[in-house]
Amino acid sequence: MRALVLLAVLLIAGCAERSAPGVTVLTYATPYAPTHPFSRADRDWMDWVERESGGRVRIVPFWSGSVLSSEHSMTELRHGLVDIGTITPIYARGGAHLHRAQSGFYGGTSTIPQQLALYRCMQAADPQFAKELQGLKVLAVQGGNLPGIVTRDRPVRRLEDLQGLRLRAPSELLSVLRHLGADPVDMPMSEVYSALAKGVLDGVVAPADTLRSLHFAEVARYFNAMGIPRGAYAARAMGERRWRSLDPELRQLLERSIEVWERALEVRILAAEEAGLRAGREHGIEFYQMPAEDVARFLKIYESDAEARARSLARFGIDALSTFRFARRIAAGLMETGEIDCTRSTNEPTA
């Protein structure tokens, strides 16, 4: 692994543009194509950094997984494969147990700013977050549109319609869907279009933006917009060693750029949802809403499952249960006041 990383670093160094005197060149890599909404937000951020630096910074992008992998991106950044990259700790196979579990702690949040605020509350309260991201400097936290249920041949009007459906779903929803009688699987989203087209999958738990961005409107017929809770996660980062090598003025610029990058992601993600809904209507997708009583039942199962997964991390020496309960207190306050309050008393009951 170390030899492969070293070889890749040398190859990238050869591909990166040579910098003029006084210009710092930073490399950026992502698994997404340059036309993906995430990549459009990345480009917005790059343009801002280069403009604000007065030409003292150039960012060289590597798109479409040409350099950085999805599964090992955090390790690759720590080794300096590239300077900055997209990371997905919620999908990491190991070493990010709390990040994976916390993605199911977001019941009650409905907007991207709420998702980011709750993530930062938990991050500030639990040092395990920083431990799992050791060796990285986080440059953006990302939330997302609330998923619905896309299906091929059978509409989902109520929870009982999930029975027997083979659905691709994120890991935090697998046991919830099994409880409801579905047959959920976890597979890369890049494989879902083909699986839907061939009938290997009956559907996928995904937000409306995928109707266009992943072309699901071409191979599906129904969308239930039930708004399943989803979490935020550290999504863009720089290797810590590279971060420390930068001059203080450039580090300050990149610190200021965090808000810019997160806002660009939010704007592009929301625009993608509108585009997805339009694409769905153009392709004749039938849209449904889940009845309120079914949503309440789903959220109860979702919360119970999240608590069970938090308890299970005790075997790794991680007290995720305290973080789960903290998140539930914050969510209860959100329901009462409409605001995320990280200081909500630990003596208050959970929702």
Mark where each language-model region is.
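N-terminal secretory/targeting leader peptides
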Residues: 15-115, 131-132, 136-351
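Bacterial N-terminal signal peptides
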Residues: 3-13
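Hinge/lid segment of periplasmic solute-binding proteins
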Residues: 120-134
